[in-house]
Design a protein with these regions (language model features):
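Flexible, charged surface loops at secondary-structure boundaries
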Residues: 1, 46-50, 71-73
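N-terminal Rossmann-like dinucleotide-binding module
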Residues: 1-39, 49
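Short acidic-hydrophobic, aromatic-tinged amphipathic segments that line or gate anion-handling sites
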Residues: 40-44
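Aromatic "clamp/platform" in nucleotide-sugar-dependent glycosyltransferases that forms part
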Residues: 59
């Protein structure tokens, strides 16, 4: 089974994941970066929504905003680097998500 993956961000962790994916039955289909748009990158987050899962590897302070947006708009699996949140309000938001959404969110 081939898994289509999208990445948010393209720092060190994303580059490590890219190498890992290339050695497994995973297709890195798209990479989102808010300031880059080219053949390999998109600056439109919705371009990632056709993937089976999305990895959030962006800077720490952006994790929650991406989690919030993806839990509203994306139906696949979400893998988020730590820390996923930076305050209690963000924790409460994640805690109050429906169980169906929580079952598709994973943290590293």
């Amino acid at each position: 089974m081939v898994v289509n993956v999208g990445l948010i961000g393209y720092g060190n962790q994303a580059k490590r994941l890219e190498k890992f994916f290339s050695r497994n039955k995973t297709v890195l289909k798209s990479i989102y970066h808010p300031k880059k748009a080219s053949k390999n990158f998109t600056n439109n987050l919705e371009d990632l929504y056709s993937n089976d899962c999305i990895f959030i590897t962006s800077p720490n302070h952006t994790h929650f905003e991406y989690l919030k947006r993806l839990t509203n708009d994306f139906s696949g699996y979400i893998f988020c680097e730590k820390p996923p949140i930076i305050n209690e309000d963000e924790l409460i938001f994640l805690k109050n998500l429906p169980d169906q959404k929580k079952q598709k969110i994973f943290f590293d």
